Amino acid sequence: MDSKFEHTPACGCLGRRNFLKMAGAATAVGIGGGSLLLAEEARADALTKEQRDKLTPEQIIKAMKKGNKRFRSGERKERNYLREQKASASGQYPAAALLTCIDSRAPAEVIMDLGIGDIFNCRVAGNVENPDILGSLEFACKLAGAKVMLVMGHTACGAIKGAIDNAELGNLTGLLAKIKPAVEATTYAGERSAKNYAFVNTVARKNVEMTVANIRKDSPVLAELESKGSIEIVGAMYNLETGAAEFFD
């Protein structure tokens, strides 16, 4: 990498103590760069293949949880997106593949403090799977080496509300039909209405759980990778009000 981007004790940007602290922190996690697992005081950079390949699925999930904690505390990593763009231009080695909703308030890279090159992100209303999505996830995990496959829903999801209300609109009708099984499978004692946010959020969670199950059922490629321990398929819910991402056990 171009030396003009590198920090050293002599550059004046950092005191010697802080520089050594940063270097020691990076060594402690077994990497010298990469935005996903660097210590909080270090600057972010693009993941390399060597760095990604050393990570376990559990470490990647832990890193995403820590990133969400930083997002909620307002202490996100210092980023130079131009630097990340240049560092990742010759190749990409994302650690995870995500299936998330298109909702503008739930951008995974932002809410988990991730950078360019950290993840693949498939976005579709209601975070539902289909053959094209499955093919994309298979590419991400089997061919490109991602080690975590995360399905993330969110609270107050408009697609969930539409499925509950049996909304119909062009091609959206068919998409919402994929969510209706989650509506039907949700056990709820209160008002089963799109106006009841507690019910909407309960359905959204069930939808994530069923999507995870469908991915395992409909993608032998991903199911085999998980059975071998090469990847972990998990679900999560993002809370629009609190900013917290809850990973399912």
What do these predicted ranges mean?
Residues 102-132:
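Active-site cofactor/substrate anionic-group-binding motifs, chiefly glycine-
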Residues 99-101, 123, 150-154, 234-239:
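Short beta-strand segments
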